[in-house]
Amino acid sequence: MFFRNGDRTDQSTKNVMTTCIFCAQVYEMDRAAEMKSGVLIWLPEIEQHVLHHIVRAIYVGRISQGPMADASRRAQDVLLARREEAKRRLGTDEANIMAMVLRDYITPRHYAQRTEKLKGVRLLPLDRRIIQESGLQFNQFPQILAYWRSKDGPFGGKIPAQWINFYQEALMKANS
């Protein structure tokens, strides 16, 4: 959940918005840094929400075997390499630094221009989500990944090895 006013104790319907875990961390980049769950990349050719769908498929595909796992690892490497351009343009790829600058160091006039100035910068979701609870730290991501792959998850139990068949069927239907 995302809390529009930043107050996690305000559970009113006007304040609470449901989001996927990847979208939520875009709104709270400082938390993404705390959980070690995202880094900044330069990727102007892909919108943020589309990147989330791509990355989710990459992580599900990566834990399979065979060509789909190899392709997923290569795709992840390509995305991670885009960190360098973010560092070159912004001086950092760390989400918490971006959040701090936006929150504490720029004037209202510059803040109003953030969309234009940061066009092309994306928060790349990583394959970890470090949660602290009762003095313990654990990586929640394996559980999230297991859900995505489950019959109730967004991939509906469809194993990555079958994805090429789904794509080919969709392509044939689109062309007929």
Please place each PLM-identified region on the residue numbering:
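Histidine-centered nuclease catalytic patch
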Residues: 1-19, 27-35, 39-42
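A generic structural micro-environment signature
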Residues: 7-10, 49, 132
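PEST-like low-complexity intrinsically disordered regions enriched in Ser/Thr/Pro and acidic residues
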Residues: 25-110
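C-terminal, charged low-complexity interaction regions
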Residues: 81-176
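Short, cysteine/histidine-rich loop/knuckle motifs that typically chelate Zn2+
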Residues: 22
